[in-house]
Every structure is written in structure tokens, then in C-alpha cells.
């Protein structure tokens, strides 16, 4: 979930929005909440400060720190470096178990990125090992803040990139994320009265419609470049041009930079096709082309499928290698 300025960019009802607003700012802005301990680490050209708020956790802080480091390493591996040079994470204990809420802001108190994580006091190591949300929130730092009608791009990117980054880092297997995509991508299909991604702000279209855009773009870029480049190259170029969460950009500017990096027009053309009209994706056909075959609750791969090499390239650890945290 991403917060930009004073508007919470999340496809939820007005009543739910009011409740989230009240919870987030009940004790003042989250970045001003009390801190009882603090640690920092370096990764991929960045310094990440991790603060722990009031309250206790069943887990030692060192185990929580390792979870944050693993998530940062996944994102830095995908982008070749951590997207912003100064980042802050606030861990606030709360009653319950698991990661209860995550929100990311840009340009707060000297930090390019600031993420607040509400972590259940009874959270276990297994919960952290299986978590996706910390990585999702870090991905938000790697794209400029957009006007509200483009929330689908911000959330869709984080939804699509998070599992791929974790595979590239070695924390997930490709079979797992392709099975998850086969299961979840249909949630982004347009329904009746859909008016395109810029104008249809349901939860499904915001998160999974945005993810469908990213998957299509990744495959199309690789098709047009003989698999030499993909969405990853476009997104790295956007970050390298300064397109991070603390900057307000028009979406088209970011897409044009990405297209220039891949030598294609895929991002701009796909956006123009999907922005104002429903454009259903033939997911069944795409899975077949990629060689992803349902097998019980999971999937198996057909490495002789027409686009099998593209599927493999999407999750392959980049040539720049794994980026590890340092003290």
C-alpha cells in the first residue's frame, strides 16, 4: 500500500479509507511515532534505517532485521541496486500475528522512502519467511509517485515485481510464483462497465489489472527484442533517471524512459490501449505460450513451448548478480 502526499492510494471504500486514516494518524504522523531502538545497514548504494516502535515482539529484533535485509536484497537484486539512497523502516508491534499492515511514503523527514510496518507481536519466523509484504513495500520506492488515476501502475508493479524479485534472489522457486500468477491474475480481468485502468478503481483492477499490464509488457518487450531485454531493463532505467517514490512524475514520462531503454514502444502503446477501455488478456493462451501447465495445486513447465525461453528469462537472476546487505 502506498501513500502519496495526503491521499492514500488504495482501492478501498470510503468508510474503510476513513478507518485507515484514523489508525495511521491517531498518534500523529507515523514518521513521528516514538522509537525505542534503531539499527542501520548498507545495501546496493543505500543506507536503510530500521526503527522499532513501542511494544514488544516474541521474535528477537535480530530476526526481524534479517527479514528486512532479505526483502531489501531481493529488491536490490532486481533493480541492480536499492532504488533510493536513504530509506527508513518503522516496525510497530501490535496485538496479533503476521504482518498486519504496510504503507510506504515518499520524501519524509530527509528520507526518500519511509515504510511503516505494523507487525503482530506473536509473529513467528515462519510468518516472516513466507511474507511478501515487506518486499512489496520496498518495490514502491522504485517508481515515481503518480496522479491518483494511475494507482493501478504503482500497485500493479509492486504486485508483479515482488515475487519475481524473490525468485531472482533465491527465496522462492519459479514454479511457486507461476502457480500463484495462474491463480491470481484473473482477479484483474475487466468486468461489465469497466472503463479502462485509469478509470476503474476496483481492488481487482488496481492490483491485478496492473499486474496483467506488467506481465504483458514484460512478454511483449522480450518478444520484440529477441529476449535480450525485458520489463526489468525498463524499470532499472526509470530508477536510474531519478524516477523514485520521492518524485512526482507524469506516468507517460516514466513509460517513455522505459521504452527508450528497451528500444521499443511497448509501454506507451500498451498504456494507450488499456487506459480508457477494457482490454481483456487471453491468460489461458498466454500460459500455454509460456509453457505453464496447471498440475493439481501447482504447475509444471513445458520447456518446448513457444515462449518458454521468455518465461525462464523473467525469473533468471540478472547478470549483475545478487546484491547482499552489509553492516
Model-predicted regions and their roles:
Residues 78-91, 145-151, 169-177, 228-234, ...:
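Surface-exposed patches in mature extracellular/periplasmic domains of secreted proteins
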Residues 73-81, 140-143, 163-167, 218-226, ...:
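Sec-exported extracytoplasmic/periplasmic mature domains
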Residues 128, 149-218, 223-225, 231, ...:
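Acidic/His/Gly-enriched intrinsically disordered linker/tail segments
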Residues 65-72, 135, 155, 159-162, ...:
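Extracytoplasmic/secreted envelope proteins and their assembly/folding machinery
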Residues 37-150:
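Juxtacatalytic substrate-recognition/specificity segment
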Residues 1-3, 11, 19, 24-29, ...:
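Beta/coil-rich, acidic/histidine-enriched accessory regions frequently appended to metallopeptidases
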Residues 96-102, 166-171, 243-249, 280-281:
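Secretory-pathway/luminal and periplasmic proteins that interact with or process carbohydrate-rich
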Residues 25-40:
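Structured beta-strand-rich cores of soluble
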